Swiss-Prot record:
Keywords: Ribonucleoprotein, Ribosomal protein
Entry function: Involved in the binding of tRNA to the ribosomes.
Acetylation is among the record's keywords: no
Subunit relationships: Part of the 30S ribosomal subunit.
GO cellular component: ribonucleoprotein complex; ribosome
The name this protein goes by in its record: Small ribosomal subunit protein uS10
Amino acid sequence: MQKQKIRIRLKAFDYKLIDQSAQEIVETAKRTGAIVKGPVPLPTRMQRFDILRSPHVNKTSRDQFEMRTHQRLMDIVDPTDKTVDALMKLDLPAGVDVEIKLQ
């Protein structure tokens, strides 16, 4: 019989928030008897933007902004029904994007 696996991918702009959410997921899964692999930190995606300061002249004067997207990956191997219910009821902060895939 093939084992089922849940792959969870977290994305957030704040690394403290994403680490806290990952820790909550790991504790919940372990408490319900599932095996957790991770969280694995994926490469941080950085987007840089150069904006002209002046609306008319002075093209050499620019502001630079950057946006960092932190990512974590976790696998929950052979989850029970109790694990899935606990993960669905878990309340995570609004700044964390969660993608869940069943494999």
